[in-house]
């Protein structure tokens, strides 16, 4: 997925059977991808993160909508200069998969349980995983929008879903 008006250089999609069959998507373009002497040695590489997303496999699932979602988040970051950090959360203003009846209507950002953080010549890069939240989970966080509350919710989700795979059928 290269070129055009999309701000990300690309999104790689990997099939994984860890925990359960799912797609593991990883963005590239929020961090410095090519060595640049002038940008070396910084605390963070560009925005300091890349996005990841784990989507439970369904029969003949079209997952391109998830890549569009990542690109839309990238447009926000690149235009506003604001970035995401661990335990931030945002509403999707409707289902994260448009024209579906999923109750997943918000996202939280957590350190990807497998990719975590890396140090590069340009600085640190955190792999922030987008985790789908139900409407009620989002409403709960909205009542007390503190990072510690998001962390508590994520720990609760991890008890039965350690890789935090988003299941569009979750209620």
Report the location of each language-model feature.
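Acidic, proline/glycine-rich low-complexity IDRs
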Residues: 1-171
